[in-house]
Amino acid sequence: MRITKIAPAQSFEREFDGIATDKSISHRAAIFALLSSAPCEVEGYLMGEDTLHTLHIARELGLGIEQKGSVLRLIPPRNGICEPHKVLDCGNAGTGMRLFAGLLSGVKGHFVLTGDEYLNARPMKRITEPLSAIGACINGRENNAYAPLSIVGAQLQTFDYKSTIASAQVKSAMILAGLQTAGQSRFYEPLLSRNHTENMLRGMGVHIQERECEDGGYEVVFEGLKETNKQLEAFKFQVPADPSSAFYFAVAACVLGAKVKLKNVLLNKTRIEAFKILESMGAKVAYHHLSSLYEEVGDIEVQGGSLKAVRVDSRIAWLIDEIPALSICFALAKGKSEVYNAKELRVKESDRIRATITNLRVMGIRCEEFDDGFSVYGGELKRARVSSFGDHRIAMSFAIAQLACGGEIEDSECIDVSFPHFLTLLSQITAVENANES
């Protein structure tokens, strides 16, 4: 087990130009290239454990991969997706498993998707039920509730599906399944979730529309590719920095009263809600738009300062990955901060509500836990040894917390899932030391 020791840090002013590239877009680049009519090029594909598992699975399914420096050339299989000779290991990647499940449900062949102990404990009925309803032959443990998932490609039907949760993974799985039908399909969700799938597929030539509904929900309407026997157009783009990864250094600015400039960050509105929360707490945040191809990209400047408590209970899907890091700001804010409607946190890589509250208490902060959230009373962070709970976002969030007081993080290897050079960047702010314990 790796133990990471973090030393207390001083205020600073710094640009960060090496933030990990976006995990969501990297996953989709590898998967969507399988459907392309010609080779695709992607610069800056995230070389984290999650996205490498997705890339390896795409290779097993027939994707050719050539690398030159930071550019990957992704060559689609000449005769369509291949049936693999082995079980497809998604590692810790819930996005990879759920998107591949949607894609492979309509592909001829037999496919088995598995993951590590954490992924195989995460809920899968949210995709197995709607996919089965449109003709997919998909089976999993405990009445299709958990992976491993066994999929036999079938003839899928168009659909008009109303989801009860806002989940980009569920939506994307259904869209990938629906692309393999002849006709129009509709997917509804109660709040717009991350829409990278829609943006990228639109750029690849899919006729896909997003609309806000009268009840505040969103629907996606699109045409299956079998209607016109159409193949997707190739893509060529550079993956921007991941706003979820950049956010840790925004929190660092708030912890230390520092100023940071985060370079070339994805600015999709469904991904920067946590920065908006920092603004409402008293931090100064500025956005500088630089480019727009499939997605808006730009720089984000954050100036830390005195923070006030806040209540977070809406647009949770837009900041679900950042809530553990936000909790560090809550711990230093004046007053009582609250999070509600965030039950989804309990079924991520760890129970992130329980993990966050446990570690904050160890660091001397008064907290209360709810079924769907938690509250934090602002105070003073104290030096402590905390657990990552095997969750990369918990590990990085509390590494940032320890900038205020120093401390240690157990089982920090999980950081490599999404941000392999996080500790290298952190060492530009303070002393970081790794040690192994048996």
Swiss-Prot record:
PROSITE patterns: EPSP_SYNTHASE_1, EPSP_SYNTHASE_2. Pathway: Metabolic intermediate biosynthesis; chorismate biosynthesis; chorismate from D-erythrose 4-phosphate and phosphoenolpyruvate: step 6/7. Keywords: Amino-acid biosynthesis, Aromatic amino acid biosynthesis, Cytoplasm, Transferase. 3-phosphoshikimate binds at K23, S24, R28, S167, Q169, D321, K348. GO terms for biological process: amino acid biosynthetic process; aromatic amino acid family biosynthetic process; chorismate biosynthetic process. Its EC number is 2.5.1.19. It is found in: Cytoplasm. Signal peptide: none annotated. Phosphoenolpyruvate binds at K23, G94, R122, Q169, R352, R393. Its main location: cytoplasm. It comes from the Bacteria. InterPro entries: Enolpyruvate_Tfrase_dom, Enolpyruvate_Tfrase_sf, EPSP_synthase, EPSP_synthase_CS, RNA3'P_cycl/enolpyr_Trfase_a/b. The active site is at D321 (proton acceptor). The keyword Iron does not apply. GO terms for cellular component: cytoplasm. It is an enzyme of class 2 (transferase). GO terms for molecular function: 3-phosphoshikimate 1-carboxyvinyltransferase activity. It catalyses: 3-phosphoshikimate + phosphoenolpyruvate = 5-O-(1-carboxyvinyl)-3-phosphoshikimate + phosphate. NCBIfam families: aroA. Monomer. HAMAP family: EPSP_synth. Belongs to the EPSP synthase family. Catalyzes the transfer of the enolpyruvyl moiety of phosphoenolpyruvate (PEP) to the 5-hydroxyl of shikimate-3-phosphate (S3P) to produce enolpyruvyl shikimate-3-phosphate and inorganic phosphate. This is 3-phosphoshikimate 1-carboxyvinyltransferase. The gene is aroA.
